[in-house]
Amino acid sequence: MVSLKVCFLLLASSELAFGAAPGARSRRRGTAPANPYDKDTTSYCTWWLDYNEELPCDQVLQANSITLEKFRRWVSGGQSNTPINQWENHKANHKAKNPSITGNCEGMTVGKSYCVEAAFEPTPTASPTGPSGPTGTPGTIETPLPTQPEIAPNCDAFHLVKQGEDCGTISATYGITSAQFLAWNPSAGKDCTGLWANAYACVSIVGHEPPKTTSQAPQPTPTKPSNGIETPLPTQPKIVDNCDKFHLVQSGEGCAAITSKYGISLAQFTQWNPAAGSNCEGLWANAYACVSIIGHEPMPTPTKPSNGIETPLPTQPEIVDNCNKFYLVQSGDTCTTIVSKYGITLSDFTKWNPKAGNTCAGLWANAYSCVSIIGYTPKPSPTPTPTKPPNGIQTPTPIQNGMVTNCNKFHFVENGNTCPVIQAKYKVTLADLVRWNPAIKADCTGLWAKTYLCVGTL
């Protein structure tokens, strides 16, 4: 059963989400309704919605993370209705009966209150569910509440997710693969950020054969495919079939640290672990990643190509082959700070490190970037010095390419600044900012931190 403290934490976050909805004057009030309500409302209600303004029913369901079936059950007396003593006097003053919610989510009336949570109601029994194939006749399966959103309808085993648990540890506990866990709990997401604490996850479906259990807690059972390589569990989702070496990802580890340890490139790692994603956002902690495949020969660290230049590892993806100078990107570095340090242009930097992208969004921390190539003569590292154009206005540096020459007011962009924030501060429009600073683009995705932005002209 969800503790009252956790329940209220969940309610608080849900109330914020609902309060942010357009025109949301209807709000989750608390443990007592302010408006009249249906006399058949469940006595187990722990949170109410005071419906003071018309809102789509589906928006109400989404904001409160409930299903239509639960909503109808709670407001129409689907459970026992023994009165709760603390609400007796309140109920006597609200005798008007609200209409029942229909099967197509209609029937809500402005000025009424509706139950949107019954945290302690008895666990209902799910209807028997059967698999799509001929795997026998299943019996009645009880589904505990609350569950993760969108669990498999034919689930027959459940795990109550505890605070701090992740998809990898749960998969390991039950001897299932990451792919199976995701298929049965799709709302968890490939990066497991959608997994809810204090809610039940599906860890088996009808017809699934779980690993044999002992008197002790189940342990991950390595699998031995036809190639003879034992695969430990759980693995990252969708790793390659011909993997012959594995690494258990620790909490806080990134792709760059792993590739450096095993002398492989970032491109190889993401090819063998595609669910990790090009920016490593899908890497799971406490799950095994593939760090070698059959026939792979690991690179020595560092490498010395035919040009005689040692290349440290790991590098940014797809850096040029003729690089002769490298910089280890630190957390918080931007393309602007790096090019300023080495006296190179942004054009050169993105040419040598193409995966960084024009907006620098693809730059990886803790990986080496190329800051010079064979035959390139760098400019002396300049000291930022204000320039004085013919209009007499000094322009601070650094600035983004293409800024207008008649600017007379500048704003230094800090981390976290956005175009709307800057617009409000200087009372200018987005069209003005884009016209004066074309590099930021019409949707402001090209705005760079630690550079000066034009916010006024002559």
Curated annotation (Swiss-Prot):
Matching PANTHER family: AM15, LYSM DOMAIN-CONTAINING PROTEIN-RELATED
Domain (LysM): residue spans on this chain: 157-203, 245-291, 325-371, 409-455
Comp. bias intervals (Polar residues): 212-229
Pfam families to which the protein is assigned, alphabetical: LysM
Parts of the chain that traverse the membrane: none
Organism classification: Eukaryota, Fungi, Dikarya, Ascomycota, Pezizomycotina
Location of the region described as Disordered in the Swiss-Prot/TrEMBL record: 210-232
Keywords associated with the record: Chitin-binding, Repeat, Secreted, Signal, Virulence
Name the record gives this protein: LysM domain-containing protein ARB_05157
SUPFAM superfamilies on file: LysM domain (SSF54106)
Organism: Arthroderma benhamiae (strain ATCC MYA-4681 / CBS 112371)
A GO CC term assigned to this protein in UniProt: extracellular region
SMART domains (alphabetical): LysM
Role noted for this protein: Might have a role in sequestration of chitin oligosaccharides (breakdown products of fungal cell walls that are released during invasion and act as triggers of host immunity) to dampen host defense.
Keyword Repeat carried by entry: yes
A GO term for molecular function: chitin binding
Signal among keywords: yes
InterPro entries in the record: LysM1-like, LysM_dom, LysM_dom_sf
Comment, domains: The LysM domains bind chitin and potentially related carbohydrates, and might be involved in damping host defense.
